[in-house]
Amino acid sequence: MDDNLQLGDSGVVKNVAKLGRRARLAAEQTSSLEESRHVRKSSSSTSMGEVPPPKPARRQGGWAEETSGSAKSGRRPAVVEDVEDRRLRPQTPQGSDDEGDIPVIPDLDEVQEEDLTMQVAAPPSIQVNRVMTYRDLDNDLMKYSAFQTLDGEIDLKLLTKVLAPEQEVREEDVGWDWDRLFTEVSSELLTEWDQGEKEEQVPLPVL
Protein backbone atom coordinates (compact mmCIF):
# COMPACT_ATOMS: atom_id res chain seq x y z
CA MET A 1 0.00 0.00 0.00
CA ASP A 2 2.91 2.38 0.81
CA ASP A 3 4.49 1.65 -2.57
CA ASN A 4 1.39 2.60 -4.49
CA LEU A 5 0.52 5.76 -2.56
CA GLN A 6 2.66 8.86 -2.52
CA LEU A 7 1.85 11.49 0.13
CA GLY A 8 3.14 15.04 -0.02
CA ASP A 9 4.01 17.39 2.82
CA SER A 10 0.43 18.64 3.13
CA GLY A 11 -0.98 15.16 3.37
CA VAL A 12 -2.86 15.19 0.08
CA VAL A 13 -3.05 12.04 -1.98
CA LYS A 14 -0.97 12.49 -5.14
CA ASN A 15 -1.55 9.34 -7.12
CA VAL A 16 -3.69 6.24 -6.84
CA ALA A 17 -2.50 3.29 -8.85
CA LYS A 18 -5.02 0.70 -7.89
CA LEU A 19 -8.51 0.58 -9.26
CA GLY A 20 -11.72 -1.10 -8.16
CA ARG A 21 -12.82 -2.04 -4.66
CA ARG A 22 -9.32 -2.28 -3.24
CA ALA A 23 -8.46 1.18 -4.50
CA ARG A 24 -11.56 2.65 -2.84
CA LEU A 25 -10.74 0.92 0.44
CA ALA A 26 -7.22 2.27 0.27
CA ALA A 27 -8.46 5.80 -0.41
CA GLU A 28 -10.87 5.62 2.53
CA GLN A 29 -8.08 4.44 4.83
CA THR A 30 -5.79 7.27 3.73
CA SER A 31 -8.54 9.86 4.25
CA SER A 32 -9.18 8.56 7.77
CA LEU A 33 -5.45 8.75 8.50
CA GLU A 34 -5.33 12.35 7.27
CA GLU A 35 -8.32 13.32 9.41
CA SER A 36 -6.74 11.82 12.53
CA ARG A 37 -3.50 13.65 11.74
CA HIS A 38 -5.39 16.98 11.40
CA VAL A 39 -7.15 16.37 14.71
CA ARG A 40 -3.81 15.74 16.41
CA LYS A 41 -2.38 18.94 14.95
CA SER A 42 -5.35 21.01 16.13
CA SER A 43 -5.19 19.51 19.63
CA SER A 44 -1.47 20.21 19.80
CA SER A 45 -2.02 23.81 18.70
CA THR A 46 -4.62 24.35 21.42
CA SER A 47 -2.29 22.85 23.99
CA MET A 48 0.45 25.23 22.85
CA GLY A 49 -1.83 28.20 23.57
CA GLU A 50 -3.22 28.97 20.13
CA VAL A 51 -6.92 29.82 20.34
CA PRO A 52 -9.04 29.08 17.25
CA PRO A 53 -10.99 32.02 15.82
CA PRO A 54 -14.47 32.43 17.34
CA LYS A 55 -17.45 31.34 15.30
CA PRO A 56 -19.61 34.16 13.97
CA ALA A 57 -22.89 34.63 15.78
CA ARG A 58 -25.94 33.37 13.97
CA ARG A 59 -28.18 36.20 12.94
CA GLN A 60 -31.90 35.85 12.64
CA GLY A 61 -34.19 38.27 10.88
CA GLY A 62 -37.79 38.69 9.82
CA TRP A 63 -40.47 36.98 11.84
CA ALA A 64 -37.90 34.94 13.81
CA GLU A 65 -36.27 38.10 15.23
CA GLU A 66 -36.65 38.44 18.99
CA THR A 67 -35.34 40.92 21.52
CA SER A 68 -33.04 39.92 24.35
CA GLY A 69 -35.75 40.32 26.96
CA SER A 70 -38.23 38.24 25.01
CA ALA A 71 -35.62 35.54 24.41
CA LYS A 72 -34.90 35.30 28.12
CA SER A 73 -38.45 35.43 29.35
CA GLY A 74 -39.92 33.41 26.46
CA ARG A 75 -42.76 35.92 26.04
CA ARG A 76 -42.98 38.91 23.71
CA PRO A 77 -43.47 42.38 25.24
CA ALA A 78 -46.83 44.11 24.94
CA VAL A 79 -45.37 47.05 22.99
CA VAL A 80 -44.20 44.82 20.13
CA GLU A 81 -47.55 43.03 20.05
CA ASP A 82 -49.42 46.34 19.87
CA VAL A 83 -47.24 47.54 16.99
CA GLU A 84 -47.80 44.32 15.06
CA ASP A 85 -51.55 44.43 15.72
CA ARG A 86 -51.73 47.95 14.34
CA ARG A 87 -49.75 46.96 11.31
CA LEU A 88 -51.93 43.94 10.54
CA ARG A 89 -55.24 45.73 10.98
CA PRO A 90 -57.07 46.71 7.74
CA GLN A 91 -56.51 50.42 7.26
CA THR A 92 -59.25 52.57 5.74
CA PRO A 93 -58.39 55.84 3.97
CA GLN A 94 -58.93 58.96 6.00
CA GLY A 95 -62.04 60.95 5.22
CA SER A 96 -63.95 57.97 3.81
CA ASP A 97 -66.50 58.08 6.64
CA ASP A 98 -67.49 61.66 5.85
CA GLU A 99 -71.26 61.97 5.89
CA GLY A 100 -71.14 65.03 3.66
CA ASP A 101 -69.99 63.02 0.62
CA ILE A 102 -72.86 60.50 0.80
CA PRO A 103 -75.60 61.40 -1.74
CA VAL A 104 -79.11 61.64 -0.35
CA ILE A 105 -81.85 59.92 -2.37
CA PRO A 106 -85.21 61.69 -2.04
CA ASP A 107 -88.28 59.72 -1.05
CA LEU A 108 -90.95 58.85 -3.60
CA ASP A 109 -93.62 60.77 -1.70
CA GLU A 110 -91.60 63.97 -1.85
CA VAL A 111 -91.14 63.61 -5.59
CA GLN A 112 -94.85 63.05 -6.21
CA GLU A 113 -95.87 66.06 -4.14
CA GLU A 114 -94.02 68.46 -6.44
CA ASP A 115 -96.39 70.48 -8.63
CA LEU A 116 -95.26 69.96 -12.22
CA THR A 117 -98.13 71.93 -13.78
CA MET A 118 -96.45 75.24 -13.02
CA GLN A 119 -93.23 74.18 -14.68
CA VAL A 120 -93.55 75.17 -18.32
CA ALA A 121 -90.70 74.84 -20.74
CA ALA A 122 -89.64 77.97 -22.55
CA PRO A 123 -90.70 78.00 -26.22
CA PRO A 124 -87.94 77.80 -28.78
CA SER A 125 -86.94 81.04 -30.38
CA ILE A 126 -87.28 80.37 -34.11
CA GLN A 127 -87.69 83.05 -36.72
CA VAL A 128 -90.68 82.16 -38.92
CA ASN A 129 -91.34 83.94 -42.17
CA ARG A 130 -94.87 85.32 -42.16
CA VAL A 131 -97.07 84.00 -44.95
CA MET A 132 -99.41 86.52 -46.58
CA THR A 133 -103.13 85.76 -46.42
CA TYR A 134 -105.63 86.12 -49.23
CA ARG A 135 -106.83 89.38 -47.75
CA ASP A 136 -103.33 90.82 -47.82
CA LEU A 137 -102.93 89.72 -51.39
CA ASP A 138 -106.24 91.37 -52.36
CA ASN A 139 -105.23 94.60 -50.70
CA ASP A 140 -101.92 94.60 -52.50
CA LEU A 141 -103.69 93.88 -55.77
CA MET A 142 -106.07 96.81 -55.27
CA LYS A 143 -103.33 99.17 -54.17
CA TYR A 144 -100.89 98.44 -56.93
CA SER A 145 -102.58 98.52 -60.32
CA ALA A 146 -99.25 97.89 -61.95
CA PHE A 147 -99.49 94.32 -60.70
CA GLN A 148 -101.73 93.55 -63.69
CA THR A 149 -98.60 93.35 -65.79
CA LEU A 150 -95.92 91.12 -64.30
CA ASP A 151 -92.35 92.03 -65.19
CA GLY A 152 -93.68 94.12 -68.09
CA GLU A 153 -94.10 90.99 -70.23
CA ILE A 154 -96.93 88.84 -68.79
CA ASP A 155 -100.44 90.31 -68.99
CA LEU A 156 -102.69 89.24 -66.09
CA LYS A 157 -105.84 91.06 -67.18
CA LEU A 158 -107.53 87.86 -68.33
CA LEU A 159 -106.92 86.29 -64.92
CA THR A 160 -108.21 89.28 -62.98
CA LYS A 161 -111.42 89.40 -65.04
CA VAL A 162 -112.30 85.81 -64.20
CA LEU A 163 -111.57 86.07 -60.47
CA ALA A 164 -114.74 85.90 -58.31
CA PRO A 165 -115.24 88.06 -55.25
CA GLU A 166 -114.64 86.65 -51.80
CA GLN A 167 -118.33 86.67 -50.76
CA GLU A 168 -119.28 84.30 -53.59
CA VAL A 169 -116.45 81.89 -53.02
CA ARG A 170 -116.66 81.57 -49.24
CA GLU A 171 -119.12 78.96 -47.89
CA GLU A 172 -120.86 79.15 -44.56
CA ASP A 173 -120.03 76.59 -41.91
CA VAL A 174 -123.20 74.54 -41.34
CA GLY A 175 -123.35 71.76 -38.75
CA TRP A 176 -124.27 68.33 -40.08
CA ASP A 177 -127.22 66.47 -38.60
CA TRP A 178 -126.86 62.71 -38.89
CA ASP A 179 -130.57 61.94 -39.37
CA ARG A 180 -131.04 64.68 -41.93
CA LEU A 181 -127.93 63.69 -43.83
CA PHE A 182 -129.01 60.03 -43.87
CA THR A 183 -132.45 60.85 -45.27
CA GLU A 184 -131.02 63.08 -48.00
CA VAL A 185 -128.50 60.49 -49.15
CA SER A 186 -131.04 57.65 -49.07
CA SER A 187 -133.59 59.68 -51.08
CA GLU A 188 -131.03 60.50 -53.75
CA LEU A 189 -130.03 56.85 -54.03
CA LEU A 190 -133.64 55.75 -54.36
CA THR A 191 -134.32 58.22 -57.16
CA GLU A 192 -131.25 57.01 -59.04
CA TRP A 193 -132.32 53.37 -58.71
CA ASP A 194 -135.84 54.16 -59.94
CA GLN A 195 -134.50 55.93 -62.99
CA GLY A 196 -132.26 53.00 -63.78
CA GLU A 197 -135.09 50.48 -63.56
CA LYS A 198 -137.32 52.57 -65.85
CA GLU A 199 -134.60 52.76 -68.46
CA GLU A 200 -134.22 48.97 -68.40
CA GLN A 201 -137.99 48.42 -68.87
CA VAL A 202 -138.20 50.61 -71.96
CA PRO A 203 -138.25 48.26 -75.03
CA LEU A 204 -135.59 48.73 -77.59
CA PRO A 205 -136.79 49.82 -81.08
CA VAL A 206 -136.90 47.04 -83.66
CA LEU A 207 -134.93 47.69 -86.79
UniProtKB/Swiss-Prot annotation:
Region entry Disordered, spans: 1-104
GO cellular component: cilium; intraciliary transport particle A
Superkingdom classification of source: Eukaryota
GO term, biological process aspect, one: cilium assembly
Keyword Nucleotide-binding: no
The protein's assembly and partners: Component of IFT complex A.
Family assignment from sequence similarity: Belongs to the IFT43 family.
Name of the featured protein: Intraflagellar transport protein 43 homolog A
Organism from which the protein derives: Salmo salar
Taxonomic lineage: Eukaryota, Metazoa, Chordata, Craniata, Vertebrata
